[in-house]
Amino acid sequence: MKMETFLVCLFHNAKGLHQQIQEILYLLRMHIYETNLYLKQELSQLIYPNRQLSFVLLMPLSLLRNWDDIEYLTDIVDDKQTLHYAANLLTNYVLHLSMYQKLTKQYFLLAVKRVSEKLNKKQQHSFYEVLVTSEALNNYENLPKNILNTLMFAVRYVFNPTPNYSEILAELKKKNKIHHIIFNMVITDFQQIREQQMCKHLCETNNELRQECKEIIFDLKVVGNV
């Protein structure tokens, strides 16, 4: 399962998180056809103390499975750091879903709105600064138009309101290269978390996992630059 390899790679050296990843993925595989209530009861036992890890794992997987009650996952998260991280991760997963044509707008929009509402109440600065200042803007080839449009939809809801929305939207459309920018935002958050929890990012040193990460993240050749 490539999702496992990717997650283990990202969280490898965070204390105690490797086992959490395995437990959550096991529950998802074993009980994916059970009722949502049963899933919530099982998964809620893993939410604390690693709330952030549980959220970032469950949110994208729940989107892929089209769960009806994504609200449960967003309701348990209130701290600013996790909301910041979740907003970035949600945007990144729009790329994943749209690439494989699995994006169901109503499910995605529900999750994005829930995170965005909380996020906008807790912090005022715009994430767009990360987007427009990224050196990666000029490094990669253009995305197909339909995927770009899907991502623009995501950006519109995740990062609204923002003071410079019109200017930055125009900049993104002009560049037409949003995939690596979104990924860069996620990596920025990984760097912040790494300063607090991680000794070293496994992808920096392990060539085999780095290659698999490249394949997972749509072969954009970004992971090697992390």
Swiss-Prot record:
User: What are the alphabetically sorted keywords of the record?
Assistant: Glycoprotein, Host-virus interaction, Inhibition of host NF-kappa-B by virus, Signal
Among its keywords, does the record have rRNA-binding?
A: no
Please name the source species: African swine fever virus (isolate Tick/Malawi/Lil 20-1/1983)
Triggers of expression = Expressed in the intermediate phase of the viral replicative cycle (immediately after DNA replication).
A single GO BP: symbiont-mediated suppression of host NF-kappaB cascade
Signal peptide segment: 1-16
Q: Which residues are glycosylated?
A: 164
| Family (UniProt) | Belongs to the asfivirus I226R family.
This chain's function reads: Plays a role in the inhibition of host NF-kappa-B and IRF3 signaling pathways. Mechanistically, promotes the degradation of host IKBKG through enhancing its ubiquitination leading to inhibition of both pathways.
Task: Identify this protein by name.
Answer: Late protein I226R
